[in-house]
């Protein structure tokens, strides 16, 4: 009995250790950065036009500082296809002629003693796997860090509450300032070390998960 209890405890601990951490909406890792800029001193000139607040028509308004907002256009499409097959054939044939002793056949019950053995095996296996995914949309993110070479570390998330659950999109990566378009957008395909996560929490998300017993049968713990 103690042996079965030990086995059950081991399986439960393994299941608990493999349970992923549930995402939270207020994750500090994705919190926006608010740069602290010194207040701008406005000289009282008596004019409506203030030179300190003017902007040139030819200035670059693309995001380039920590805290600036950049829109990432999600254009992700992946497709993977794999096929494998093998065939094994094996055969053996052995024949032993009747045994002679003293010039006559050795028999048992009037039946000559001989041996005939034939064996064959044919195994054929085939497997195919085809998977494709696509993700289109957009999400605004913050510039979290400006690297020494001018590249920008961007990170952001978007949460949408729908009925009994929440859906979220999270993105983080590194972009070049030269790849940012004039409308302050950049394609997700131009991001390096991109991490894009689209998932959800709540009743509908839980319904799509595999139960712990099914996970055990599909894991490496199942010996068969």
Curated annotation (Swiss-Prot):
Metal-binding in keyword set: no
Subcellular localization, as worded in the UniProt entry: Cell outer membrane; Bacterial flagellum basal body
Keyword terms of this UniProt record: Bacterial flagellum, Cell outer membrane, Lipoprotein, Membrane, Palmitate, Signal
Listed InterPro entries: Flag_Lring
A Pfam family hit: FlgH
Gene Ontology molecular function, alphabetical: cytoskeletal motor activity
Assigned protein family: Belongs to the FlgH family.
Name under which the protein is recorded: Flagellar L-ring protein
Native species: Shewanella sp. (strain ANA-3)
């Amino acid at each position: 009995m103690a042996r079965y209890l030990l086995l059950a405890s081991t399986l439960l601990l393994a299941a608990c250790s493999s349970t992923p951490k549930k995402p939270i909406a207020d994750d500090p890792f994705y919190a926006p950065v608010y740069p602290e800029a010194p207040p701008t001193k406005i000289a009282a000139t008596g004019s409506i036009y203030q030179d300190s607040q003017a902007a040139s028509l030819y200035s670059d308004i693309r995001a380039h500082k920590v805290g600036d907002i950049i829109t990432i256009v999600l254009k992700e499409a992946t497709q993977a296809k794999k096929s494998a097959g093998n065939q094994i054939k094996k055969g053996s044939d052995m024949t032993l002629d009747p045994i002679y002793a003293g010039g006559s056949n050795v028999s048992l019950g009037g039946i000559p003693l001989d041996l005939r053995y034939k064996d064959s095996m044919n195994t054929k296996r085939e497997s195919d796997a085809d998977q494709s995914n696509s993700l289109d949309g957009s999400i605004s993110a913050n510039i979290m860090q400006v690297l020494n070479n001018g590249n920008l570390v961007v990170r952001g998330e978007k949460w949408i509450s729908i009925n009994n659950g929440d859906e979220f999109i999270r993105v983080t990566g590194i972009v070049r300032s030269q790849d940012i378009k004039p409308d302050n957008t950049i394609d997700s395909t131009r991001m390096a070390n991109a991490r894009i996560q689209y998932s959800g929490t709540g009743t509908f998300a839980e319904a799509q998960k595999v139960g712990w017993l099914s996970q055990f049968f599909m894991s490496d713990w199942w010996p068969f």
